[in-house]
Amino acid sequence: MCAKMRRGALNQALLDRGLNKLALGHHYDDAVETLLMNLLFEGRIGCFQPVTYLDRMDVMQIRPLLYVEEKEVANAVNRLQLPTVENTCPADGGTRREEIKQLLQTLEKDYPGLRTKIFGAIRRYPLYGWDTETLQR
């Protein structure tokens, strides 16, 4: 299932159970990749927000893994033997995000610490929803 359909199904499952908070699995690398995707493919500086409120559904989406790198998440999944679900989206693996992931790997060889610098820029740049006040709520 593709991301938008999956998120819609998760939001509906929450509402069906009388819940209103959804923890999404976006991590550090997702934020860096999203910023670069927006910059390169849309010509804008932007990234998803750490906390998003969907007022039409009264659902709060949180991203508690934002400060955790993808490799750390993968290591924890393996170490704790957590079950995983295969992505059945037909575009999986052949996406713009995958292109950006490969680009970052290449750039990191010549510019060590690039991901850290980009993530730092996300935190310092006045992106909506990334300010300290919003994050403390």
Regions found by a protein language model. Give the residues of each.
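Active-site adenylate/phosphate-handling loop in enzymes that bind or generate adenylated species
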Residues: M1-E72, I118, L135
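The feature marks non-catalytic terminal segments
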Residues: L82-R137
